[in-house]
Curated annotation (Swiss-Prot):
Species this chain originates from: Sinorhizobium medicae (strain WSM419) (Ensifer medicae)
Pfam families: Aldedh
Protein name per the record: Gamma-glutamyl phosphate reductase
Function summary: Catalyzes the NADPH-dependent reduction of L-glutamate 5-phosphate into L-glutamate 5-semialdehyde and phosphate. The product spontaneously undergoes cyclization to form 1-pyrroline-5-carboxylate.
Gene for this chain: proA
GO molecular function term, any single one: glutamate-5-semialdehyde dehydrogenase activity
């Protein structure tokens, strides 16, 4: 493994070497048995528990640096690791270990009139480059998911989480070695220089097969603009909740507060609340009061001043903002049609929820909104691969090609065709 180097070193040469090693490791990993990959992941989970004190000490360094730089509380929350979060990380990896191995699965098969038997079979993608920012848990999730799917991975975390990610990466390597798999199958970029990102986006001389960016709008935009390899885009989570006139108020209140306030700094946190104008008198005040009581700042459109005066006014900028904080924008809309219109204008195509009891309203919401995840009578905070039973996720893909929604093990595979004959030649 490459050791940490100074930024003044030749970043391009370092990255090309990482790419070469990843490509070499991808070949044996692609044919590794399900049992060996399972053993590696179980060993990783064990290492996380055994090294928890080291990981927390490394995280303390990152947190100290972050606080000195004056970052927002939401950023600190995303960066923070605790004993509980490390246990959750380990449990998530154990869950990934127990998933069915996708590699070699026959997705479909059929016979042709000429006697050929055709199978479509899952295969690893190859080498995946993951570029992310302040969440150190992505190091564990991405490494484990790529390993389960038989892919080598190059991890480029943000400089803010460097010490935490490096400590977690050591656990991943320990698991690989324990199972007799190549240590270079999971590599971490050892330089903070942003030129490393640019090098990854070139594909490292054909070594990288796909890039997964996980971070803010500027990072994802850069990746999409500069990448010379396919990208699974994880855009911002500008998530909406629409509360219909038919909604159960008690249920709506519980869901809205959870969707916004459970963890404000995750991409599945609700950022805009849309309320059916036809039930404003019944719904608006109790929903807003519940949010305020939970410690949330409410920014409301002008028409809500008659229902609940004294709220901060919302602007068009608010409808386009992923706060990742205890702030929500609220608007009255003309029923389901108004909700659909607003969401289709402002959504990032990540996650939207509807709270309603009228089936026809729900079906319109599901059919006319084209976001990756749509929920009915459930919190947007369920937009998570672990909650979907995937064991974890490498991100929420908001594009429409190949992977969409939570990118789990299955989405990190491609396929090939196996055609079996008995001597056929084409006339």
């Amino acid at each position: 493994m490459l050791e940490t180097v100074e930024n003044g070193d030749d970043v391009k040469a370092i990255m090309l070497e990482i790419g070469r090693r990843a490509k070499a490791a991808a070949r044996p990993l692609a044919v590794a048995s399900a049992e060996r990959k399972h053993a590696a992941l179980v060993a990783v989970a064990g290492a996380l528990g055994a090294r928890a004190a080291e990981i927390l000490a490394a995280n303390a360094l990152d947190l100290e640096n972050a606080r000195e730089s004056g970052v927002a509380n939401a950023f600190i929350d995303r960066l923070t690791l605790t004993e509980s979060r490390i246990r959750d990380m380990a449990d998530g990896i154990r869950a990934i270990a127990e998933l069915k191995d996708p590699v070699g699965e026959v997705i479909a098969e059929w016979d042709r009139p000429n006697g050929l038997h055709i199978e479509r079979v899952r295969t690893p993608l190859g080498v995946i480059g993951v570029i992310y920012e302040s969440r150190p848990n992505v190091t564990a999730d991405a490494g484990a998911l790529c390993l389960k799917a038989g892919n080598a991975v190059i991890l480029r975390g943000g400089s803010d989480s460097f010490h935490s990610s490096r400590a977690i990466h050591a656990c991943l390597v320990e698991g690989l070695k324990a199972a007799g798999l190549p240590a270079d199958a999971i590599q971490m970029v050892p330089v903070a220089d942003r030129a490393a990102v640019g090098a990854m986006l070139t594909g490292l001389n054909g070594a990288v097969d796909v890039i997964v960016p996980r971070g803010g709008k500027s990072l994802v935009a850069r990746v999409q603009n500069e990448a010379r390899v396919p990208v699974f885009a994880h855009l911002e989570g500008l998530c909406h909740i629409y509360v219909d006139a038919s909604a159960d108020l008690a249920m709506a209140t519980q869901i809205v507060v959870n969707a916004k306030m459970r963890r404000t700094g995750i991409c599945g946190a609700a950022e805009t609340l849309l309320i059916d104008r036809n039930a404003a008198e019944k719904l608006a005040r109790p929903l807003i009061e519940a949010l305020v009581e939970a410690g949330c700042e409410v920014r409301a459109e002008s028409s809500l001043s008659s229902v609940m005066p004294g709220l901060k006014s919302a602007t068009d900028e608010d409808w386009a903002t992923e706060y990742l904080d205890a702030i929500i924008s609220v608007k009255l809309v003309d029923g389901i049609s108004g909700a659909i219109e607003h969401i289709n204008i402002w959504s990032s195509a990540h996650t939207e929820a509807i709270i309603a009891e009228e089936p026809r309203v729900v079906e319109r919401f599901f059919s006319e909104i084209d976001s990756a995840i749509l929920l009915h009578n459930a919190s947007t905070q369920f937009a998570d691969g672990g909650e979907f039973g995937m064991g974890g996720e490498i991100g929420i893909a908001t594009g429409k090609m190949h992977a969409r929604g939570p990118v789990g093990v299955e989405q990190l595979t491609s396929f090939k065709y196996r055609v079996r004959g008995t001597g056929q030649v084409r006339p």
